[in-house]
Amino acid sequence: MMTETVRTWRHIPQRYNLTGSKCLQCGNVFFPSRIICPECRRKGKLEELKFSGKGRIHSYSVINTPTDEFKDIAPYVVAIVELEEGARVTSQIVDCDPDSIEIGDEVEMVFRKVREEGEDGVISYGFKFKPKT
C-alpha cells in the first residue's frame, strides 16, 4: 500500500508538478516528459519544463455513466487541455457545471484529490483543471 503512494509522489513528479520537456533544437514541448524528441531524434537536446498550468479546452466529454470508483461525482467532465506552452494533457475539469463547458474555455490547474486507495484510505493527489475565474 505505502509503496504505491511513495512511487506516486516521489518517482512520478509530473503527477503533481505538471512538468514536461522541451526540445532545445526544434522547440516542441511534451507531456509527459520524453528523453528523445520524436522530431529531431538524437540531434535534439531536451530540458525539463515546468508548465504554467494555464490553457484552453481543446476537446471534452461529459461522463454520465462512470465506473464504480467515480459514481459519486458523476456527471463530470474529462477534457484534453492545450496548455499555453503547446502541450496537451488529459484531465478532469472541476468546480463547474458540466453543461457550461465549451471548447476554447480558459482553464487553470488546481491540485486535488484523485482517489483513495484500499481500506486504509490512503489518498493520492494530482492536478486537475478548473474554469479560469
UniProtKB/Swiss-Prot annotation:
Protein name: DUF35 domain-containing scaffold protein
Subunit annotation: Interacts with acetoacetyl-CoA thiolase and HMG-CoA synthase (HMGCS) that catalyzes the first and second step in the mevalonate pathway, respectively.
Organism in which the protein naturally occurs: Methanothermobacter thermautotrophicus (strain ATCC 29096 / DSM 1053 / JCM 10044 / NBRC 100330 / Delta H) (Methanobacterium thermoautotrophicum)
Keywords in alphabetical order: Metal-binding, Zinc
Lineage of source species: Archaea, Methanobacteriati, Methanobacteriota, Methanomada group, Methanobacteria
Coiled-coil regions, chain positions: none
A Pfam match: zf-ChsH2
Keyword hit for Ligase: no
Function statement: Functions as a scaffold to connect the acetoacetyl-CoA thiolase and HMG-CoA synthase (HMGCS) dimers in the channeling thiolase/HMGCS complex, which allows for efficient coupling of the endergonic thiolase reaction with the exergonic HMGCS reaction.
Chain sites annotated for binding Zn(2+): 23, 26, 37, 40
Similarity field: Belongs to the scaffold protein DUF35 family.
Record-level Gene Ontology MF annotations: metal ion binding
InterPro entries named in the record: ChsH2_C (IPR002878), ChsH2_Znr (IPR022002), NA-bd_OB-fold (IPR012340), Thioester_dehydratase-like (IPR052513)
